[in-house]
Amino acid sequence: MSQEDSSFVKLSVFGNIFQVTTRYTDLQPVGMGAFGLLCSSTDQKSGGPVAIKKVMKPFSAPVLAKRTYRELKLLKHLRHENIISLLDVFISPGEDIYFITELLGTDLHRLLSSRPLERQFVQYFLYQMLRALKFVHPAGVVHRDLKPSNILINENCDLKICDFGLARLQDPQMTGYVSTRYYRAPEIMLTWQEYDSAVDIWSVGCIFAEMIDGRPIFPGKDHVHQLTVITELLGSPPEDVINTITSENTRRFVDALPKRHKISFADRFPNANAEEIDLLEKMLDFNPKKRITAADALAHPYLAPYHDPEDEPTANERFDWSFNDADLPTDQWKVMMYSEILDFHNVDVKSEKDMTPSTTTAGAH
């Protein structure tokens, strides 16, 4: 590792100290990411722009260390054209962790706020989102927080999904309070358990509707109102969905909702064509078991201009979630994090065992 790569500089960005290697210059604030501060920067090694996410004090508590470890593992594992790529990672002498990723010019939230999207852009953006999900879902990874602001887009209309830090194993006891409300699948609110990759399809369906219509399809004011606005379009939850509700309180709430009939999607989206409406209805099915999969959605006639089964890979192996049930002390997560970072930089962990943390964390590769 060169001296240049292993030396750090402190830079103040709008009152926040970024302690980065000298490889990164021209830091400019972008905003808050999931659990971290975001900056744009110039990578002196490549000459190109990058995004720097600072996760503050990940070793201050086991829950923070575990969450950061999960994000690191996922970024390393999920290598796909439509998922944001990890370019570099290091732990600063101040023990903050920095993720360096590709920098894309804008996100879908900003695009939708500025102007209506033309049909070919709606089609191409939807295709790329589903292409990413076809890759991650067989790996046992669910994003769980898909929304326009974490759909990144560059000037060539290349799309990449970011913020997989909240993603978790498809297990029967998935924790309940995740996705931004407008894009949250009804089964999350109804059961808080036993949900899977279908929640991502619902979220992308909501984004699809928003791209068509120019406004959120289900703008709930709170948890209760969210379910109400869903039933105003889709009608009352069907019996097969109600029967999955395990909470008595939730069951009583659903039973007390006014009985509603489904509204025609063609009436709700008068500017959409028949293929758009058909796919949208398949994505926004109340019953997650009947909701279309990413692979089947890619094969839908609406996406025929882009669909190519030979160029829509799935993950080769399932993501190893064995760490996720571990209840470890912070120091153990720290050791595991250093090991993952060394592995990312292709450093032989055994040969580096005598190195001190300050010399093993710099971003050199």
From Swiss-Prot:
Residue positions where Phosphotyrosine is found in the record: Y177
UniProt cofactor(s): Mg(2+)
Chief localization: cytoplasm
Keyword vocabulary terms for this entry: Activator, ATP-binding, Cytoplasm, Kinase, Nucleotide-binding, Nucleus, Phosphoprotein, Serine/threonine-protein kinase, Transcription, Transcription regulation, Transferase
Keyword Transferase recorded: yes
Bilayer-crossing regions: none
Signal peptide: none
PTM annotation (Phosphothreonine): residues: T175
One Gene Ontology molecular-function label: MAP kinase activity
Compartments (UniProt record): Cytoplasm; Nucleus
A cellular component annotation (GO) from this entry: nucleus
Family recorded in the similarity comment: Belongs to the protein kinase superfamily. Ser/Thr protein kinase family. MAP kinase subfamily. HOG1 sub-subfamily.
Primary role: Proline-directed serine/threonine-protein kinase involved in a signal transduction pathway that is activated by changes in the osmolarity of the extracellular environment. Controls osmotic regulation of transcription of target genes.
The name this protein goes by in its record: Mitogen-activated protein kinase HOG1A
Annotated gene: HOG1A
